[in-house]
């Protein structure tokens, strides 16, 4: 339905906004991996790939990806583990999703509108 799409699009715009903030600090990344519950939706991953205008890779066993990533980070900072290379294994890719070029221009305009609405209503968040 339209309401479901609006929610997915709004969350995706929020993710795009975060990625744009990261790009402001460091634009030197090419690989983006998708993990977690949202990765079960090929529709959503394709929408994100289009918004980000980047290929997204779905990791094998992506439902465990976030927890595994946190566990690996914890192990990486553990001074008792001397061989740090054993922690990081090559990520197995289950599927890749490419941007939909026809939709990119449309979503880019909608993102600018979303950003304008977000900024103009920012003061209301403190009241709510």
Residue ranges and their predicted role:
Residues 1-128:
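Glycine/Thr-rich phosphate-binding loops that ligate phosphate moieties of nucleotide
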